[in-house]
Each structure stands twice: as structure tokens, then as C-alpha cells.
Amino acid sequence: MIGKLKGTVDSFGEDHLILDVHGVGYLVHCSGRTLQALPRVGEAAVLFIETHVREDQIRLFGFVTEAEREWFRLLQGIQGIGTKTALAILSTLKPSDLAQAVALGDKTALARANGVGPRVATRIVTELKDKVPAFTAADPGLARLAADVEATEAAGGALADAVSALVNLGYGQAQAHTAIAAAGRKAGEDATTETLIRLGLKELAK
């Protein structure tokens, strides 16, 4: 199995490139985001490879980071998602944004990808939420966000209502969870929704 290729970009197609490795041209399928990140024709490139072997063909899928490849693998484990849809998702969301969308349960962000409807978006969140911590370890900001989301969702009640209120005011889910988690730490367990919203808005105004 091929795990990594290092060579020279020979040409680009709509959803792939030809990578010349010592005179052998490998056709590698990529997400739109990966194709945009690659250097120009004639320049050196390195791709992490996922190899799919079928009875009638061998297909290579390339990624600029191992995290992107791992998300590609995880996404295909979900009913209704094949290689085409997985690449469409990775074309729309970079790995850190995908992890954030799953952690926040942001189905709208996921549904922006071609081929992802409400049901598939829901399955992505439900089935991959437990996998997000593995991707947050190397990203302190994302790790804090995941912890804040877990704290507000586990507590429920006033915290959850306060998050919902901030989202309704137009703040993003990540902003709302982070602000209300900070407000909750300051106000304590018995804080009312109104108090949390007030403190949360102060956090957002900093």
C-alpha cells in the first residue's frame, strides 16, 4: 500500500493531479482545498496517500496533512458517505473547522458541502463527536473549545439556555459556548440564565 508520495506536479485535473515520481505519473484524487494548496506544475510536492483497492481498479487519494487523511477515513465510516462526498466535505471545511463543526453540532456548516443533507450532517455529528478529542490535542484553542462545549452541554439548564440566547443574538456557536463557559466559571453553579447572558456578553466585549 502507498502511504506517501513525493514528486513533481505534472498536471492538474478538475478533481485530481498527476504527480511524477521518478518518471512514473501517479493520478491522485484530491479535495478542492488540497488542489489549491499544492504548488504549481513543475514544482515539488508531498502528499499523504490513502489507497483504495477494488477488483477492477486502484485509486489514490492525496492529502497535504495526515489530519485531513484521517478525517477522510472517518467520514467514509458513516452511512451515506463515500469518497466523493468525503472529498466534498474536505473541500468545504479544513480539518480544524470540521472538528469544530462536529464538536459544536453545527449541522449547517456541514451541510454546506455538496452531497450532505440534514440527515447525513446529523449522522456526522452523532457518530464522530467522540472522535474529536483526538484532533484537539495538537490545537490548544480547539481543545479549549471542545472542553467548553462539553461543560455547557453536560450542565444543561441555565448554561444551555444562555448559549442558545447568544446564538439567537447573532453570535457564532463557538463564541457563545466559550463566553458562557467563562461566565459559568465566574458565576458558579447557581447562576441564572440572565446572569450568564450578562456575563457572557461582557466576555464577548473584551
Curated annotation (Swiss-Prot):
Residue segments, region Flexible linker: 144-154
A matching Pfam family: RuvA_N
GO biological process: DNA recombination; DNA repair
Signal sequence region: none
MF (Gene Ontology): ATP binding; four-way junction DNA binding; four-way junction helicase activity
InterPro entries (alphabetical): DNA_helicase_Holl-junc_RuvA_I, Hlx-hairpin-Hlx_DNA-bd_motif, NA-bd_OB-fold, RuvA, RuvA_2-like, RuvA_C, RuvA_C_sf
Sorted UniProt keywords: Cytoplasm, DNA damage, DNA recombination, DNA repair, DNA-binding
Region ranges (Domain I): 1-64
Region (Domain II): 65-143
Residue segments, region Domain III: 154-206
Gene Ontology annotations for the cellular component aspect, listed alphabetically: cytoplasm; Holliday junction helicase complex; Holliday junction resolvase complex
Superkingdom in the source lineage: Bacteria
Classification via SMART domains: HhH1 (SM00278)
Localization in the cell: Cytoplasm
Role according to the record: The RuvA-RuvB-RuvC complex processes Holliday junction (HJ) DNA during genetic recombination and DNA repair, while the RuvA-RuvB complex plays an important role in the rescue of blocked DNA replication forks via replication fork reversal (RFR). RuvA specifically binds to HJ cruciform DNA, conferring on it an open structure. The RuvB hexamer acts as an ATP-dependent pump, pulling dsDNA into and through the RuvAB complex. HJ branch migration allows RuvC to scan DNA until it finds its consensus sequence, where it cleaves and resolves the cruciform DNA.
UniProt free text on domains: Has three domains with a flexible linker between the domains II and III and assumes an 'L' shape. Domain III is highly mobile and contacts RuvB.
Subunit note: Homotetramer. Forms an RuvA(8)-RuvB(12)-Holliday junction (HJ) complex. HJ DNA is sandwiched between 2 RuvA tetramers; dsDNA enters through RuvA and exits via RuvB. An RuvB hexamer assembles on each DNA strand where it exits the tetramer. Each RuvB hexamer is contacted by two RuvA subunits (via domain III) on 2 adjacent RuvB subunits; this complex drives branch migration. In the full resolvosome a probable DNA-RuvA(4)-RuvB(12)-RuvC(2) complex forms which resolves the HJ.
Family: Belongs to the RuvA family.
HAMAP family according to UniProt: DNA_HJ_migration_RuvA
Protein name: Holliday junction branch migration complex subunit RuvA
Name of the gene encoding the protein in the UniProt record: ruvA
